[in-house]
């Protein structure tokens, strides 16, 4: 089989024009191989004159009057000696059980292949064509036609005799005939006719276009595409005819069917054969010697084209020039094209050669892609059609692609394709790794090595890591981060890194990688030391992930120096593992760090670190004065005397004022504001906060000889102190800045207060009236008294069991009920009775509203 394929490929290479192959990269549509075996021996001694194709076998006629039955591979299965001269045509029925043969000496034989019984006749003229009814074996009246100088129809009657009918004559020799269903198509010197055997009517006559061509040299090619579509090729003309049913209303004396030419076009070369291929046409061309379209040495090579018919033309899909044996000696009439409808096989028959053309399958497509070095497309095609390919293996194609990429020097792509191609084959993986090592490209393949459930031997990974350690520290660090620690011997790699650190002890990349290796090996203390030494950002993640708090108790200062915020957050979040006292003890010699820790602790919880609040006063004063006053305001545990002492030593006026006021020495605090800050606004604000008349007096006394202070007081005192007190104490003749504006503001504020009071009074009166009316409406409503109610004094039912007797009940607005005799005597105000229960809480709502008597 491999020999046949190689022969086919060789023929295909021979049959494709080399100049066109250089210009185009289009993949051929068909592949070719010679029909060999018994055919080769036959054609060495004889020459092929005709051939008919059946799905099961082939029938070959020769110039020496012999007919050979062949299998699909060309082996001879049967041989018939029919005549001593050329066999003109062979016809088979659909079942392949009967054959019809005609020869140049006028012999016609129709017989069964499994029995020689049949029709045997000698005519006095050459018989050019013969055609059996497609259902010859199954029909009772066996029918066939022969054509010489006239077309004769033979059918066997009920007496088992052959009846002859002339279908056509008088227009020269019949050169071609094709029978499909009930339709017989034939060609003579004038044109093509179609006869309906069912209605016994000739339904069309398609005239031949180029009458200058000799019919015997350029015979007509007929081919049925289906039961109603006939393809006619004659000379350089192609016509596609559709047989259609005629409308019964238009028949009159016309046949029941008619023919419509649906497509007609001219070709570049002479047509030797036609065959359908789906909705396209396969055409066999004879190229005349005087054609200017081809090179001199290829002028008479036949061509096999695939064309797409259009209504008024055609489009060429593919074109192959075929090198058949002795093609230089052949004429147009020497070529024939036969096809097998079942398998889309096309047979090109010439006197000394038979070539089989077939559609290319997926294997052929991949062959072509590999030949053109389109390995990626070949790999993709193989993956998509892996169930249908027979000669190719996806992995082998992938390996060829990888080899091609390596040869090109595209190592990165080659390494990337290894993942897809090598898959789970660990032996192939190891071979590729060693190949990449040989060419010095381990770096390219390293990132694609298996690292999941399927793994290579640890030695492979270690080899790559050692190679990176020699040439690329960053690449080595990347692999250590990306590869799981189980892939290689961790201790061996640690030892190798330590050897390199002896040469370069400060290399941060190697140190970081060593810390990661220690982490994989669960030696977290060593990893932590390296991270702290390098101030690496992952140190906190390492501590949290592996719970290394016991290892950092003596390294708190280092952590704080690296990142105060992260360190403090971590320490505060894990107080159960590192106590607050331990942290304070470690930071006692670094007060600035201690302040950061205690400050965040205070922000989280004002009471948790209360025993350190006294120490925090000096820390705030030293390192963070802006937060000292908020601390003093919020802390309930700092000693005020100590705080006052520190603030006075450092002359922190605002903090001292706050402490004095908190300790009750408001006058001293106000004095400091006026004397040391000289800020009347703050003094006024302080006096407002304390709301102490004596402080206001002190403030006025201190400000009375200071015009700017008087202005500030006039602008702000109106709502707290009567401005007249201040105005009366102003000395006559004292010049006060913006006095008029201040007085206007005082009057405006006074008017505003009066308006507010009046407005409030109106609202109060309106609300009081509304509430009084609502209460009056409520009190006017009746109160339900029934057997379920009880006296709040004696706790017996409020209504007597015998309602016919006289009784008295008192019901209050509070809904408490009493028997009249159970109430105490009225109060000091005659006529007003109070509820005993509610009068202890308030007066008024419990006044009696209803007295029931009966």
Swiss-Prot record:
- Principal subcellular localization: membrane
What does the record give under GO molecular function?
Answer: zinc ion binding
Enumerate the residue ranges forming zinc fingers (RING-type): 791-839
Q: What PROSITE patterns does this protein's entry cite?
A: CHCR, ZF_RING_2
Q: Which domain of life is it from?
A: Eukaryota
* Biased composition range(s): Acidic residues: 14-26
Question: Which positions does the entry assign to CHCR repeats?
Answer: 568-712
* Any single GO CC term annotated in Swiss-Prot or TrEMBL for this entry: early endosome membrane
Sorted alphabetically, which SUPFAM superfamilies does this protein's record hold?
A: TPR-like, WD40 repeat-like
Recorded hits in SMART domains, A to Z, give:
CLH
Q: Without the gene, what phenotype results?
A: Disruption of the gene results in melanocyte pigmentation defects, decreased body length, and bladder defects associated with abnormalities in surfactant production or distribution, consistent with abnormalities of lysosome-related organelles. Mutant animals also have defects in the optokinetic response and eye movement control system, suggesting cerebellar dysfunction. Microglia from mutant fish show morphologic abnormalities, with larger or more numerous lysosomal compartments and increased expression of acidic lysosomal markers compared to controls.
Q: How does it assemble?
A: Core component of at least two putative endosomal tethering complexes, the homotypic fusion and vacuole protein sorting (HOPS) complex and the class C core vacuole/endosome tethering (CORVET) complex.
Family the entry assigns = Belongs to the VPS41 family.
Would you tell me the protein name for this molecule?
A: Vacuolar protein sorting-associated protein 41 homolog
Organism equals Danio rerio (Zebrafish)
Q: What is the lineage of its organism?
A: Eukaryota, Metazoa, Chordata, Craniata, Vertebrata
Q: Which gene encodes it?
A: vps41
């Amino acid at each position: 089989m491999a020999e046949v394929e190689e022969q086919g490929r060789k023929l295909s290479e021979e049959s494709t024009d080399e100049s066109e192959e250089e210009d185009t990269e289009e993949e051929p549509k068909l592949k070719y191989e010679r029909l060999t075996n018994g055919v080769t021996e036959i054609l060495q001694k004889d020459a092929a004159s005709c051939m008919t194709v059946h799905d099961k076998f082939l029938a070959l006629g020769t110039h020496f009057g012999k007919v050979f039955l062949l299998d699909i591979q060309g082996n001879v299965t049967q041989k018939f000696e029919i005549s001593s001269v050329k066999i003109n045509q062979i016809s088979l029925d659909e079942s392949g059980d009967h054959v019809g043969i005609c020869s140049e000496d006028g012999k016609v034989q129709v017989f069964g292949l499994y029995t020689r019984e049949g029709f045997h006749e000698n005519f006095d003229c050459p018989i050019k064509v013969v055609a059996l009814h497609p259902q010859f074996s199954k029909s009772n009246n066996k029918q066939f036609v022969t054509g010489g100088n006239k077309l004769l129809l033979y059918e066997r009657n009920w007496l088992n005799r052959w009846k002859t009918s002339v279908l056509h004559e008088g227009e020269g020799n019949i050169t071609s005939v094709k029978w499909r269903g009930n339709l017989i198509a034939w060609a003579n010197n004038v044109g093509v006719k179609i006869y309906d055997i069912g209605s016994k009517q000739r339904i069309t006559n398609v005239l031949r276009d180029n009458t200058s061509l000799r019919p015997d040299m350029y015979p007509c090619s007929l081919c049925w595409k289906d039961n109603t579509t006939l393809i006619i090729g004659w000379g350089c003309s192609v016509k596609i005819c559709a047989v259609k049913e005629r409308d019964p209303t238009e028949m009159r004396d016309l046949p029941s069917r008619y023919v419509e030419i649906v497509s007609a076009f001219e070709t570049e070369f002479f047509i030797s054969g036609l065959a359908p291929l789906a909705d396209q046409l396969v055409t066999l061309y004879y190229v005349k010697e005087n054609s200017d379209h081809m090179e001199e040495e290829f002028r008479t090579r036949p061509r096999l084209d695939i064309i797409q018919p259009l209504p008024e033309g055609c489009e060429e899909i593919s074109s192959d020039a075929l090198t058949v044996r002795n093609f230089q000696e052949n004429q147009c009439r020497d070529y024939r094209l036969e096809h097998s409808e079942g398998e889309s096989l096309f047979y090109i028959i010439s006197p000394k050669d038979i070539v089989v053309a077939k559609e290319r399958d997926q294997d052929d497509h991949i062959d072509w892609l590999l030949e053109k070095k389109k390995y990626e497309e070949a790999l993709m095609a193989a993956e998509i059609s892996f169930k249908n390919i027979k000669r190719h293996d996806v992995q082998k194609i992938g390996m060829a692609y990888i080899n091609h990429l390596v040869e090109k020097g595209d190592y990165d792509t080659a390494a990337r394709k290894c993942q897809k191609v090598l898959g789970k084959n660990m032996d192939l993986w190891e071979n590729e790794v060693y190949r990449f090592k040989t060419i010095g490209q381990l770096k390219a393949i390293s990132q694609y090595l298996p690292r999941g459930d399927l793994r290579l031997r640890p030695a492979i990974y270690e080899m790559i890591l050692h190679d990176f350690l020699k040439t690329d520290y960053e690449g080595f660090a990347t692999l250590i981060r990306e590869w799981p620690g189980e892939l290689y011997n961790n201790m061996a790699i640690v030892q190798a890194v330590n050897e390199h650190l002896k040469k370069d002890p400060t290399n941060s990349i190697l140190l970081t990688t060593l810390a990661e290796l220690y982490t994989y090996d669960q030696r977290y203390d060593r990893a932590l030391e390296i991270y702290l030494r390098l101030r690496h950002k992952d140190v906190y993640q390492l501590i949290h992930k592996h719970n290394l708090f016991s290892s950092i108790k003596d390294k708190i200062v280092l952590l704080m120096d690296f990142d105060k915020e992260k360190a403090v957050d971590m320490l505060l979040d894990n107080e159960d593992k590192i106590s607050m006292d331990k942290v304070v003890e470690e930071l006692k010699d670094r007060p600035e760090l201690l302040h950061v820790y205690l400050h965040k602790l205070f922000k989280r919880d004002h009471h948790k670190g209360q025993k350190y609040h006294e120490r925090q006063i000096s820390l705030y004063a030293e390192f963070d004065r802006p937060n000292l006053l908020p601390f003093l305001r919020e802390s309930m545990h700092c000693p005020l005397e100590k705080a006052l002492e520190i603030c006075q030593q450092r002359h922190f006026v605002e903090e001292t004022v706050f402490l004095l006021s908190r300790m009750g020495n408001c006058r001293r605090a106000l004095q400091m504001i006026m004397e040391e800050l000289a800020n009347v606004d703050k003094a006024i604000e302080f006096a407002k906060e304390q709301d102490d008349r004596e402080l206001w007096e002190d403030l006025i006394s201190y400000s009375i000889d200071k015009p700017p202070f008087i202005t500030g007081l006039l602008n702000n005192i109106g709502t707290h102190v009567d401005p007249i007190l201040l105005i009366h104490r102003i000395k006559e003749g004292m010049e006060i800045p913006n006095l008029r504006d201040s007085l206007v503001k005082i009057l405006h504020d006074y008017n505003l207060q009066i308006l507010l009071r009046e407005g409030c009074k109106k609202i109060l009166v309106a609300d009081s009236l509304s509430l009084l009316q609502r209460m009056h409406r409520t009190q006017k409503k009746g109160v339900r008294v029934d057997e379920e109610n009880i006296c709040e004094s004696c706790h017996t039912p409020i209504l007597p069991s015998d309602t016919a007797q006289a009784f008295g009940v008192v019901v209050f607005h509070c809904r408490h009920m009493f028997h009249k005799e159970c109430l105490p005597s009225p109060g000091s105000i005659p006529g007003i009775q109070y509820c005993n229960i509610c009068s202890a809480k308030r007066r008024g709502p419990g006044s009696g509203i209803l007295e029931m008597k009966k």
